[in-house]
Structures are given as C-alpha cells and as structure tokens.
Amino acid sequence: GGPGHSFLEANLVVEEMAAFCGPTGRIVVEGNMGAISAILHYGTESQRRMAAEMVLAGDKPAICITEPDAGSAASQMTTRADKRGDKYIVNGKKHWITGGGVSRLHLIFARVFDEGGNEQGIGGFLAIRDEAKGLRIGAREPTMGLRGIPETEVFFEDLEISADMVLMPPSGFKRGFADLMNAYNSQRVGAGTVALGLAVGGYRNALAFAQEREQFGRPIAEFQGLQW
C-alpha cells in the first residue's frame, strides 16, 4: 500500500508541505515516521495489523515519552509499569505529547518492574485511549508555534496493559529502550525536514516581499543591507 515513495522522496514532499504549513508537515511525519515505525519494527503481527487498521481509519498514533523532568534525557523517565500476573499496571505522567488529546492509539514508554519489584529496563506499551481505563488526557500545553497540532499532558493512573499490548524488541527490556529509540531515526530526519521546509517557506515569503516593497524609488531587495 501507499504511494511507493522512497524515504528521500517522502521527505521532499514533507519539506514542501512544511514550507506552506508547518503543522501539516509535522502531522505527516508523526503519522508515518513516529510510533508506527516502532510498531512495524518490533510489533507482533496482531499489533501491526491493529495499528495499520487504525491509521487507515484516520488515526495518528501518539508517542508518550517526554516527562516534566525527562526531556532530552528521556532515559530518566519515572513513569513505571509493574507486572502483575499477565498484565502491567502503568502509573505516571507525560507531557508535550503530540496529538495526545486526539490520537486513539498511544505508545507509552515506562520503566518496567517485575513482580518482585526489580527493575527490568524500559519498555513500550500500547493503549487505545477511548478503551483504556486509567488513561487521562490533561490540559493542552501552549507552544510558540506549530499550533495546528495539539500538545497535551497525559496521565496514567493504574492503567492496565495486557501482555499482548507490550511492544517487545528481540533484546527484551534490558536493551529495549535503545532498540525502540533506533526505530525513530526516520522521525528524527522528518523533524529536520519540517524545520528546513519552514525555513524555505520563510525565505520565499521574505524574498517576495523584498522584491515588491519599494523605498527611494526601487525595491528594497536592491539595497545592500538586504542582500547580505
């Protein structure tokens, strides 16, 4: 399925989208290079099928990683998933979650503890927002730009995750975080592409204005101060 574009071609399309509307470019990146990438890499057949069906229905999965005290240093997250029988109980808080309030499928990162309280590493857990008890969407958070795509707080209060909704890389929880992060390399490129598109759009608009606006009888684009 899909248009069959290469990764380079897809980013060229995103760049042009972002040149006109940054949020639109970012929505494409988040929907095609974010959580869905990790699910395709490490999800089971049933998990991949579930995610694909939701995306085809219009959903854009949300990635729940960032916390108030764990931004760039994401490995310092405190959200935890405690194993109880064949389930995991997730408690914690995430913020700046892109599309958190509108996405149905959430990929949640949390520290994993076995039934004896021993930490196992960091894992990924899938939850469907409107079916999950214990997943609560908080306030929409203000941003300087890209306001066309919402950023929200997400709270987990004894959220139950069944074993079949655990995203498990072959390395298990010990190296799971590193493996899952590697699955986001395409999203990192996409984020840079959106930034480049915004810069291109800004340059085009500035150039058009400088060629149209006149002072002292000629376009201001002809003045050395604007040509530097």
What are these language model-derived features?
Residues A57-T66:
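A short, Trp-centered hydrophobic/proline-enriched beta-strand micro-motif
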Residues A70, H95-G101, L146, Q187-G190:
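Glycine-rich phosphate/pyrophosphate-binding beta-alpha loops
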Residues H5-S6, A73-S75, G99-R104, N118-G121, ...:
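Short glycine/proline-enriched turns and hinge-like loops at secondary-structure junctions
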Residues V14-A18, A110, A127-A132, E157-I161:
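Short Ser/Thr-interspersed hydrophobic loop/turn segments at strand-loop and sheet-helix junctions
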Residues G1-G58, T98-L105:
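Internal helix-loop-helix
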Residues T79-D82:
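A structural signal for short hydrophobic beta-strand segments in well-ordered beta-sheet cores
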Residues N91-I137:
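A short core secondary-structure module
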Residues G124, R136-W228:
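Glycine-rich beta->alpha junctions and the first turn(s) of the following alpha-helix
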